[in-house]
Swiss-Prot record:
Belongs to the CRISPR-associated protein Cas6/Cse3/CasE family. One of its GO terms (biological process) is defense response to virus. Changing S224A: About 160% of mature crRNA produced, CRISPR plasmid interference restored in a deletion mutant. There are 3 CRISPR RNA loci in this organism and a single cas gene locus. A CRISPR-Cas type I-B system. Component of the Cascade-like complex (Cascade I-B), composed of Cas5, Cas6, Cas7 and crRNA. This is CRISPR-associated endoribonuclease Cas6.
Amino acid sequence: MRIELALDAVADAAYDRSYFHKARGRIWRGLENDDTFSETHDSNHGVGFSYSNIFPWGQIEEGDRRYFRIASPRRGLLDTLIAHFGRERAFEIGQMRFTIDDITGHAPDVGEAGSTGVLETGTGVHCALGRQLAEEYNLDTSKIDAGESETELFWRPKHGMEPLQDAIRRSLQQTHELYGDDYYDGPGEVDEPLFDRIEPIKDDVVYPVRFQPATAVDRTVLLSKWRFGYRVRDETHRYHLNLALDSGIGQRREHGFGFLNLTDKTLPRASD
């Protein structure tokens, strides 16, 4: 599930490429008065949402129409935000200032068993490998040992695709355990992969981004953007893919990373 805000710019502005922290703060303004969500604001697992960038990308002129999406597997969270944005129409991300003209809800679905399609990351995937995962794949942890990478190692192409896919699966499993449907096995409890095909969107695969996880804290993180092809095997797999659409993939999703869009879908042919 997700909501889309239709935004009208109230002033000219340069596009803020380091919008992550400010956008997260604007979303939290809509949740802070609800104890269900405010009590987990600073928890390790968060409350379960991801969000897009403000799009289309580029210089903003007064009167421009832009859009912003927020996704979550928690219907109550989105209902709370809809009510808030309906009352508080100002939407300001630093110098990017908008008013909310319209709010719409969407429930993208990858389709029944046999459906094929493509998911694309609208924002970069944050994938930092902890020591345990790095050691499982026999990766060089010398930078971690030397304190150069704190306690994590950012994924790079030289590490191979398996650690990336494993990290994505583990983070989605955590979301399943916190906010998913316990009728289904989680993505970490099945042997089959989430995706049939994985293609990088950017030629260089990974790219650095300045990131402010908290006020007065500046970091540079490595991100990657992906195009994921899929064929739905069964209802459990359908649930896993839709959960990824609702929650995003990778780490720090509540900071604006790993937001997914369904860009192509083909339903199975009806049998003769």
